[in-house]
Amino acid sequence: MAGFMKYKSVSTTIETVRLKLILTAVLFLFPFSQTSGASRPIIEIKDGQEIKVQAAQHFCYNNTIIPGWRETWTRIQVRVWSTTKLKVTVVNDEQDLKELEHFSIWKLVQYFVREQTNETTISVSLFNNKTCFRVDPSESRTLYTVQPSRHFDIYLFLVFLAGVLLFFYADVLSRSQVFHYSAGMSTGMIASLLILIFIVYRFLPKKSPFYMLVVGGWSFSLYIIQLVFRNLQVILTDHWHLAIGYVFVVGFISFAVCYRYGPLVEERSINILSWALQIFGLLLVYAGIQVQQVAFAIMIAAFCSKNLEYPFNTAFMLYHKLKPKKLEPRRLLTEEEFQRQSEVETQKALEELRKYCGSPDFNTWKTVSRLQSPKRFADFIEGSPHLLSNEVSVHMQEYGLGGSFFEDELFSTDEEDKEEEEDGWETEDDIKPEVTSPRMNNTRGK
């Protein structure tokens, strides 16, 4: 009997809690059901137009320009700001806006997930003809402003430029110690929570129930990183001392870890890092260009220019080797160049002769027996000059500038030229025949 009374009391308590939850849900969902079936007007907005309205409104932006290569770094944004908090819900078209008026569980979830801010920016795709959104201010009487704009985005261009530089300099960066430490410290400061969760994951035993906690920790870390980047300006302005302390502590720990393991040494690891940097660079190129066709064309061109470099160089070298070369006339040496080259080559030949005479292959006795002055030959091998001073002076007198040899050559050449010219005037045809008188012939005949 006591057990039955206890069971009845517990059942009554559960029914009471269930009834309270149902009443709370009905009271909470009543405001959402009030707009069911209501239809709000849609406000069309254009580039450069500024609209100030109150209460929850529906807006649609019509993109009339067909995207081309000129819109490579063009960004379309719709800026919404107010003095109080507001929420913005982005949809595709008017039909989705009408569905927002009807109550649904998904709408309720999105209502709590969306963050309230004083200012937000909606990025519109160049390829969407129409983009619609709804603005829900926290107070219905609050005045807020909606302004679309189309402009050149310098950040997109910088992302594209960073991707191109990273792709082409991936091989150099993968072997650089400066890049190793700077990338390690940057990764540690940006993803410190992710790294901490990964370290905890390494120490957890297998089949541990904490794996679900780790998965939730990864999601929470990503949310924290996104939240920090969204409020980075506020953090650097109001909490700059905490930001400096975080950068100093986490940066030092990251540097210590990078210094402990050191830069990559194995060639395969360096190649893997280089490939990863190239892939990341191509992703940055794709993210920095609004027009997909232009992005793919630049990515393919960059890939071909980097990886087809070696085949093109090989083909170019083969073409130059197989192509017949034109023989260019050799330049004659000047007198100073001839004198300098002769001295260098003479000294080189003498050194080679000394080395050969000192080698085991040299037959010393046979050579000495044929020499008139063996002592002079021995002095030459030991490093003495191969000519005596008087021999040098005699050579200069005979063969130097102004020597007897050059004078004989000059004068003999002039005389021989004159003789050749004189001899050249007389030929066999010019020889006169002998003429005899008839008397002499008769005398001889007798």
From Swiss-Prot:
Its main location: nucleus. GO terms for cellular component: nuclear envelope; nuclear inner membrane. InterPro entries: NEMP_fam. Disruption phenotype: No discernible effect on morphology, viability or fecundity. Simultaneous knockout of nemp1 and nemp2 results in viable healthy animals but both females and males have impaired fertility with females laying normal-sized clutches only for the first 3 weeks followed by a marked drop in fertility. Residues 1-37 form the signal peptide. It is found in: Nucleus inner membrane. GO terms for biological process: erythrocyte enucleation; erythrocyte maturation; oocyte maturation. Keywords: Erythrocyte maturation, Glycoprotein, Membrane, Nucleus, Signal, Transmembrane, Transmembrane helix. The keyword Nucleus applies. Residues 410-446 are annotated as: Disordered. Residues 410-431 have a biased composition (Acidic residues). Glycans are attached at residues 62, 118, 129, 441. The chain crosses the membrane at residues 154-174, 181-201, 209-229, 239-259, 269-289. It comes from the Eukaryota. The keyword Nucleotide-binding does not apply. It is a multi-pass membrane protein. Belongs to the NEMP family. Contributes to nuclear envelope stiffness in germ cells. Involved in male and female fertility. Essential for normal erythropoiesis. Required for efficient nuclear envelope opening and enucleation during the late stages of erythroblast maturation. This is Nuclear envelope integral membrane protein 1. It comes from Danio rerio (Zebrafish). The gene is nemp1.
